[in-house]
């Protein structure tokens, strides 16, 4: 003991032990220790009172420190792994290539204002506006660049479950859906006035997405919206009239998530029946089903064409599908804690294991090389499709509670002007799953990836991760 502690430390330890023994009524043990220590320790009632509880505090402090050390060691190992997987070029590159950018802690902004869990987020396709929905029944509009609240949108009477920007070109709308069985359309250009309410579902509306131009060959496809519901159906709406133009039935339980293909021809939907379905909108029939998940499916994502070369290698194809094709590869996330990658024929390509709780949202990197996921384990994970889907980054402190949603800011298209100079027209790129509009083939275009993601959580906060 003398080799480890100074004389003063040893004396304090002895006093703490004596005080502890006295506090738990081990008087004989306390007296025996005092007698054995003799005059080396002077202790009276006041000293006993002073040192009472000190030993327990020291003990719990040690336990807390051990946990912090373990957390730091885990974080250090993750950073070392990230460093090992980085190339010398990427380490030296000051302005990182946006096609390989990945989010990292800390978040640029933490947006606070909701009074209940945040359930959904969506980026405006042009401006620096972000919409978030919550169990508190409100939608909040933020300036994600400044980290400031712009307005609170009220109208739903129960939890807001999903939001999405889209609609006709030049007339962007915000759609929201809720446990109150309705879908609402809001006009951002008119102070987010509620311009239409779409009733029709018989239960909670879980997900809503605008369908990109070209859906089913319809000239009015830019006006189409798809919704998924606990009533087991998908509904297609014309936002200009408010009419439901098609109902897709086939799921046998709650449909929780839906994603349209970039050309609007297909829909991927999944939910409590654990069977994702790829729907052909022109025929309103299921094209493929995907079997493998062992629990409720919370989220789905359709891979962009930029991911085809990497996913083709994983699936064993000699060459990737043409970039002009859509709905070739998919990702699904489940309460079974796994992410599964599929091809359009329903074949399982890869199972991604790493999350310790329900997987809640997915987003393919617009650059095509990565897939991002969030889960109830409070983490964001980045999977590298070029490295057998290795998890190359974990943001373990993404939120203080379950992470419920994730969205990537849609890329922008820059159209070449008459003089050949690129001019940003504010059109979301064709690689975006939000209001994806195909660029004019007669005009030179350049896709500009925005390195920004947003996440929401049960901790009632929205976090912005950006360059």
Curated annotation (Swiss-Prot):
UniProt-listed InterPro entries: Dynein_regulator_LIS1, G-protein_beta_WD-40_rep, LIS1_N, LisH, PAC1-like_LisH-like_dom, WD40/YVTN_repeat-like_dom_sf, WD40_repeat_CS, WD40_repeat_dom_sf
One Pfam family it belongs to: LisH_PAC1
Chief localisation class: cytoplasm
Superkingdom, natural source: Eukaryota
Ranges: WD repeats: 113-154, 156-196, 200-247, 250-289, 292-352, 354-393, 398-428, 429-466
GO biological process, one term: cell division
GO cellular component: cytoplasmic microtubule; kinetochore; microtubule associated complex; nuclear envelope; spindle pole
Domain LisH: 9-41
Subcellular location: Cytoplasm, Cytoskeleton; Cytoplasm, Cytoskeleton, Spindle pole
SMART domains hit by this protein: WD40
Gene3D superfamilies noted in UniProt: 1.20.960.30, YVTN repeat-like/Quinoprotein amine dehydrogenase
Region (Disordered): 417-439
PROSITE patterns: LISH, WD_REPEATS_1, WD_REPEATS_2, WD_REPEATS_REGION
Residue ranges of coiled coil: 60-87
Keywords: Cell cycle, Cell division, Coiled coil, Cytoplasm, Cytoskeleton, Microtubule, Mitosis, Repeat, Transport, WD repeat
Regions of compositional bias (Polar residues) in chain numbering: 422-436
UniProt GO molecular function: dynein complex binding; microtubule plus-end binding
Domain remarks: Dimerization mediated by the LisH domain may be required to activate dynein.
Function noted in UniProt: Positively regulates the activity of the minus-end directed microtubule motor protein dynein. May enhance dynein-mediated microtubule sliding by targeting dynein to the microtubule plus end. Required for nuclear migration during vegetative growth as well as development. Required for retrograde early endosome (EE) transport from the hyphal tip. Required for localization of dynein to the mitotic spindle poles. Recruits additional proteins to the dynein complex at SPBs.
Family: Belongs to the WD repeat LIS1/nudF family.
Subunit structure as annotated in this protein's UniProt entry: Self-associates. Interacts with nudE and dynein.
Protein name, as recorded: Nuclear distribution protein nudF
Source organism per UniProt: Aspergillus fumigatus (strain ATCC MYA-4609 / CBS 101355 / FGSC A1100 / Af293)
Gene giving rise to this polypeptide: nudF
